[in-house]
UniProtKB/Swiss-Prot annotation:
Subcellular localization(s) per the UniProt record: Plastid, Chloroplast
Stated name of the protein: Uncharacterized protein ycf34
Keywords of this entry: Chloroplast, Plastid
Keyword check for Plastid: yes
């Protein structure tokens, strides 16, 4: 699971912006200005006979500041 959803920096984070792009999601912020320190992204690839699926999750970040429910767009 991506830890970004509970991080105070989610709206300004360039790494989360990248993850949104990879998941083909609408961006919270089109021009993020925050560069996190040492983010670690796990890329999980799964496939079956017809479908390949790629999941991008930020699992570690030195800039992480906990703020539960940060992903909720009603907060912005």
């Amino acid at each position: 699971m991506c830890i970004c959803i509970n991080c105070n920096h989610i709206a300004e984070c360039s790494t989360y912006h990248l993850i949104e792009s990879r998941h083909k999601q609408v961006h919270i912020n089109e021009n993020p200005s925050f560069m996190p320190e040492f983010p670690v992204i796990h890329v999980n690839i799964s496939s079956n006979s017809r479908i390949n699926q790629i999941d991008w999750d930020l699992v570690e970040c030195l800039s992480f500041v906990e703020k539960p429910n940060s992903w909720n767009l009603n907060n912005y």
